[in-house]
A protein has these predicted regions:
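Thiamine diphosphate
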Residues: 1-253, 258-259, 393, ...
Length: 408
């Protein structure tokens, strides 16, 4: 009931390690080390707690299986109808995700027999596009504030309770910062749906501190996570609906900028069922092939059109599942004799390294090169940032032309 000051207050506390147990106080020896025998009994006596040694001995006699298998379950959901984005529709993948999430959420909100969709947020609903869901399903939206590590744990734990647990955040926060918590979600066979926005170089003026250029490599360290990097709004919509229903941990990763739907002859190429592990050919070509990660497929198609003007017909594959290598697409690409992988990810540890390593294991032969992020990116409009990194359409075309010279 005292007076409140309208300014920040810092409270400093001096604590005592091992407080309450005389032989432990101010000694680091017992950090991670249990007292045993007479010392344990003395500690329990000083703390006023019961001696549980006899009970523990009885528990040790019980028989437990050496291991138990935990099988994540597919959610019972009405996924609604996928939206179609046409040639005139330019939007960002974030908005396509948010729209699909809100629709599925509303279709199943408080419906008997349907899995509840629970969405977690860390003060970024406007940026990660979960605001529409919050309006339509207010009781299923949890605002956690700026507590990314806690939220990663909570979202993973919630998935064990029979709900579809979704957490959307920037890539650097949801994965890079909360890496160990996501690792534990993998260990525990959770069912979190992690949506990472602002990945790669596509963060605008926020610059290098917010450029998550290692998400593929971080996810590749896990054994059970599925990673999807949609190529355009159509694929984002379908991948979102697929992820919400799919058992286990699933990560969707996308950038910030608006981009057109990938089309051919005025028809959307990715307005089709999403299949995990499929690299979709979005442009035909016999002279060379580009394997492009996620939204880089759009720039790769533009590069292929520039190359076509010079008589080089280049196939383009939209690689949306970098951890699940499509060996059919990889083999097809290598049959052209010239393969360029393109990604706005650390070039050393991204999709290119994974896919070319697999090509070697399969005994595929071709001139191949990786194109990607080779230093921390700049701060500025995305198009300028990509150009400075050598990842604009014209720079991609130049890189492939140079590679073709090596192939001769």
């Amino acid at each position: 009931g005292g007076a409140r000051r309208r300014r920040p207050t810092a409270i400093l506390c001096r604590t005592t390690m091992g407080k309450g147990v005389s032989f432990m106080e101010d000694k680091p020896d017992y950090h991670g080390k249990a007292a045993s025998g007479d010392l344990y009994r003395q500690a329990m006596k000083e703390l006023g707690q019961p001696d549980l040694v006899a009970l523990a001995a009885e528990h040790k006699k019980a028989k437990f299986s050496a291991a138990r298998a935990v099988e994540p379950l597919e959610a019972v959901l009405d996924l609604g109808a996928a939206k179609v984005y046409g040639p005139a529709d330019t939007t960002d993948n974030r908005s396509a995700f948010g729209s699909a999430l809100a629709e599925v959420g509303q279709l199943n909100y408080k419906k008997t027999g349907r899995a509840p969709v629970l969405v977690f947020d860390c003060d970024l609903a406007g940026s990660v596009k979960t605001g529409e869901f919050a309006k339509k399903c207010p009781d299923n939206f949890i605002q956690c504030g700026i507590q990314e590590n806690t939220t990663a744990t909570a979202a993973g734990a919630a998935s064990a309770g029979g709900v579809v647990s979704v957490w959307a955040d920037f890539g650097v926060f949801g994965l890079a910062e909360a890496y160990n918590q996501q690792r534990m979600n993998d260990v525990n066979r959770a069912g979190e749906k992690l949506v990472l926005t602002h990945v790669g170089l596509d963060v605008g003026e926020d610059g290098m501190t917010h450029q998550c250029i290692d998400y593929v490599s971080l996810m590749s360290n896990f054994f059970n996570w599925k990673l999807v990097v949609p190529a355009d709004p159509n694929q984002t919509d379908r991948a979102t609906r697929w992820a919400l229903k799919t058992a286990g941990n699933v990560c969707l990763a996308m950038g910030r900028s608006k981009l057109p739907a990938l089309c051919a002859n005025g028809k959307p190429l990715l307005a089709r069922d999403f299949t995990y592990g499929e690299a979709v050919k979005v442009r035909e070509g016999k002279d060379a092939a580009i394997l492009a990660l996620g939204a880089m497929a759009g720039r790769a198609v533009q590069a292929a059109e520039l190359l076509a003007e010079k008589g080089v017909e280049t196939a383009v594959y939209a690689v949306s599942c970098p951890l699940e290598i499509d060996e059919r697409a990889l083999t097809e690409a290598f049959q052209t004799g010239t393969v360029l992988t393109v990604e706005d990810h650390n070039v050393v540890s991204g999709m290119g390294s994974l896919w070319l390593a697999r090509a070697e294991e399969l005994g595929l032969h071709s001139v191949a090169r990786r194109l990607g992020v080779h230093r921390y990116g700049d701060s500025g409009p995305s198009e300028e940032v990509y150009a400075a990194m050598g990842l604009s359409a014209d720079k991609i075309a130049e890189s492939l032309e140079e590679l073709k010279k090596v192939a001769r």
